[in-house]
Structures are given as C-alpha cells and as structure tokens.
UniProtKB/Swiss-Prot annotation:
Protein name: FMRFamide-like neuropeptide 18
Modification(s) after translation: May be processed by convertase egl-3.
Principal location listed in the UniProt entry: secreted
Any one GO MF annotation of this record: neuropeptide Y receptor binding
GO biological process, one term: neuropeptide signaling pathway
Location of Phenylalanine amide modifications: F93, F111, F129, F147, F169, F180, F205
Signal peptide interval: 1-21
Subcellular location: Secreted
Gene Ontology CC: extracellular region; extracellular space
Propeptide feature: residues: 22-83, 97-101, 115-119, 133-137, 151-158, 184-195
Tissue expression profile of the protein: Expressed in head neurons and weakly in ventral nerve cord. Expressed in the interneurons AVA, AIY and RIG, the motor neuron RIM and the pharyngeal neurons M2 and M3. EMPGVLRF-amide: Expressed in cholinergic pharyngeal motoneurons M2 and M3.
Function per UniProt: FMRFamide-like neuropeptides. Ligand to G-protein coupled receptor npr-1. Involved in modulating locomotion quiescence during the sleep-like state called lethargus which occurs during molting between larval and adult stages, acting via npr-1. Together with flp-1, plays a homeostatic role by acting on the GABAergic neural transmission at neuromuscular junctions to prevent overexcitation of the locomotor circuit. Plays a role in the navigational capacity of sperm and the targeting of sperm derived from males to the fertilization site in the uterus of hermaphrodites.
Length: 208
C-alpha cells in the first residue's frame, strides 16, 4: 500500500510540474507617448516590407555597415563630394576615410572591383582584410588576406605580377607568409637574398 501511495505522489508531482511548465507568461503593456521626431525618423527609415533600419552617420561611414549595392558617385556630386562610387556587389564591413586618401580601417571585408585609380585596379573577386597605406605608396600592413591578381608592383623590386589564386597573410618580406600560387621566375639576387622560384600550388609558412 505504501508502495502505491509513493507512486501516486510522484505522479501528482510530475503532473503539477508539467502544468506549471505550460503556463502562459503574462506581459504588461506600457503605453508611452512617442515624440513626433521619433515617428518621423521611423517613417524615413521604414522600408516597403515594413522593416526598419537604423539611421546611418551623416558622412555615410558608420563602422559596421554591411552593404550590398551601389553608393553615390564621387564625380557626380550627388549629395557630398566624399561619397565614393563603387560597382554593384560591394560587401564591406568597416569605416573608410575620405575619397582623396582611400584609406580603410582594419576590418574591411570587400568583394568587388576597385577602379578609382587606373594603377590600383583589382580584378573582381578581391577579398581583403587589413588596412591599406597611402594610395601612392601601394603598401599594406601585415594581416592582409587577399584573393585575386596583383598587377601594380610589376616594375618595383623586380617583382612580377602574380597569378590569380594568391592567398597571402602578412607582408611580402616578413616571416609568416602563407601563400598559394606562383612567386617569381627570377633567380637574381636582391639585397643579398636569392629570389626562390615556386611552382603553382606551393603552400608555405615561414621565411622566404
């Protein structure tokens, strides 16, 4: 008898626990007066499908912007002269500076074609993470991850352009280079260092 009473007690506890688990929560709705300014901002940022997006900075360079499509033109003088023209398909995360410097803060992820300078063109499919230096120097800090073709350093330091498919982390002359592709066909000495050849498909990490 005591055995069955224990079973019934356990069953009742389980039933009560299940009933409490399915209890609907009660929410308190607080009605507040919304200022007219907030209503206007919400209307301006509301899309046709009802989605509301946060307002961007005045200069259009708010960090953390994920954008797909075409921005305003630099030479068209739409709203301001600091807007940069880019082809559709640009995916960028990060804040850029003004168009005369063409700088990007670390954390820029971009896919698309850059064509604001003829000597700095990149083929479509460029994936780059890192900060670029002054555009006339064409240098990049360590931490650049890029997939695409480089063709603007063909005349400097006896370096030829690289074939598409180059994956590189770090600067060219610092230890820790991870690269897939063809380096150079030259066997000449530069600054006392022998330029080594690499066949396409070489994955290397370490010193040159």
């Amino acid at each position: 008898m005591q055995r069955w009473s224990g079973v019934l007690l356990i069953s009742l506890c389980c039933l009560l626990r299940g009933a409490l688990a399915y209890t609907e929560p009660i929410y308190e709705i607080v009605e507040e007066d919304i200022p007219a300014e907030d209503i206007e901002v919400t209307r301006t940022n509301e899309k046709q499908d009802g989605r509301v997006f946060s307002k961007r900075d005045f200069d259009g360079a708010m960090p953390g912007v994920l954008r797909f499509g075409k921005r305003g033109g630099v030479w068209e003088k739409r709203e301001s002269s600091v807007q940069k023209k880019e082809m559709p398909g640009v995916l960028r995360f990060g804040k850029r500076a003004y168009f005369d410097e063409k700088k990007s803060v670390p954390g820029v992820l971009r896919f698309g074609k850059r064509s604001y300078f003829d000597e700095k063109k990149s083929v479509p499919g460029v994936l780059r993470f890192g900060k670029r230096d002054v555009p006339m120097d064409k240098r990049e800090i360590p931490g650049v991850l890029r997939f695409g073709k480089r063709d603007y350093m063909a005349d400097s330091f006896d370096k030829r352009s690289e074939v598409p498919g180059v994956l590189r982390f770090g600067k060219r002359d610092v230890p820790g280079v991870l690269r897939f592709g063809k380096r150079s066909d030259l066997e000449e000495h530069y600054a006392g260092v022998l330029l080594k050849k690499s066949v396409p498909g070489v994955l290397r990490f370490g010193r040159k």
